[in-house]
Every structure is written in structure tokens, then in C-alpha cells.
Amino acid sequence: MIDACFSAFKGEEFQFEDQTATVLYPDGAPNGKIVFRTEYLGAFPNFEQEMLRRGYYVINVTHPNYYAEYEHIHQMARFVREMAAKLGASEKCILSGVSAGGLQAFRFALLYPELVSVAYLDAPVLNLLSLAGFGDAERDEALWRNLSRICNFTESSILIYRDSPIDHLDEFMKLDIPVVMVYGDSDTVVPYHENGKVLEDYYEAHGGKLAVFGKAGCDHHPHGLEDPTPIVEFVEQFV
């Protein structure tokens, strides 16, 4: 069921392979471009709402879990290609990745850069070691049990794990994907200095296209900006 926050827009929900997919249609004439919200479609949606008002499609497909397993990233790529063909839109989408959706967005862009024009990352999970509570994040035992079960981690194996997004910044930088990032400087769930700040520093050191908006005193929630215009203006430079 499509979230009530999108009630002002036409939308469809349907089956895509073994997952549930959603497409939201823009106000007025579509501009042939897609925003791909990778996770939590109905949460803090003001960026997507504004993009719908500006003529963009918004799409989403569910996942069995949050942790961006590679088989699911490949499924996301098949979904984007199918939706672009169905809608007559460009395959190069705007990624919108919030929290764990940032992990999905990063891996998607790394594997399928031909399907990405620009990425908006909001308090993104870019470091699984941090997410699991082996840093400054508050340890969530239920999350750790779930992560360790799905990804076959032990407390020893995750300490030597080197397949988080922050371990692939050199490869990612070479793809020349513009990034706009939003974060709270008091995030206790996905601490910025262990996640997004690593990407920010790397982009700045290597001349990447980047805009960053920090929110003083903000924890992991709420996501986004009260006025999404700065995010929208950044992404529209690259579509």
C-alpha cells in the first residue's frame, strides 16, 4: 500500500520478481527522469515530493533485508532498467539513499555507474563495522544479531571485513558521481565521522563533486532538510 504522504500523486504498486515495487507519477508532464529511492519510501519524503512536483518519476523496490547483498543490488539494476523502458525514461537515475538506503545506493552506484547520474545520501550507512556497534554508535544487540545472521559475521570476522563503502572510495571516486549529503552532527545510530565524513574527506581531497549539509544538534532522525531546495538544486545540475 502506497504511503499516505504521497496521496497527492498518482501511484502504482506491483510485483517485481519476488519483491514489491512502487512507481509514483509526477505532477504535469513528466520530464523523462527517475528518482530511485532505495529504502524507506514513505519516511521523510519531502525531497521526493518536490521532485514529483518538478516532473520526475519516483520508484522503489523492496528488499529482503537492509544490508545491500549483491544479489539484491543486481535485482535493483534489473528493476531500474525495466522501469526506464516502461516509462520511456532515462536509465540514468537520481539515487536517494537514506540511512541503510545509503549503503544500498553506494553499492548500486559502484556496480552500475551507467545507471546513475547523481546521488543524494542522507545519514548514510557507509561502514558496517560502525553500524554493528564496533565504534562510537550505540550498540543495538538485535541489529547485530540480525546483521551477523544475514551476512555470516562473527565478532572476529567483522573486525577484518573490508567490503564496506568506505573501503571502496578510490573506485567510487573514479566514477565521477556527484554526491549531495545531509547529516546530523549528533547522530548516535550512524555516527557521521565513521560514515559520511570519510566519504566527504575523500571527495574533498580528490576534487569530487560534492555538497554537504550538516544539521547542528540533530540525531539520526529526522532525515532531510525542512526545505529540500538545496538538495534539489544540487542534483538538478547533473541530470
PLM region descriptions:
Residues 189, 193-239:
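C-terminal catalytic histidine-bearing segment of alpha/beta-hydrolase fold enzymes
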Residues 31-40:
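Short beta-strand element of the alpha/beta-hydrolase
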Residues 140-195, 201-204:
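The feature captures the conserved acid-bearing segment of alpha/beta-hydrolase catalytic domains
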Residues 87-99:
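Alpha/beta-hydrolase fold nucleophile elbow
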Residues 1-30:
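N-terminal cap/lid segment of alpha/beta-hydrolase-fold proteins
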Residues 67-88:
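Alpha/beta-hydrolase active-site loop
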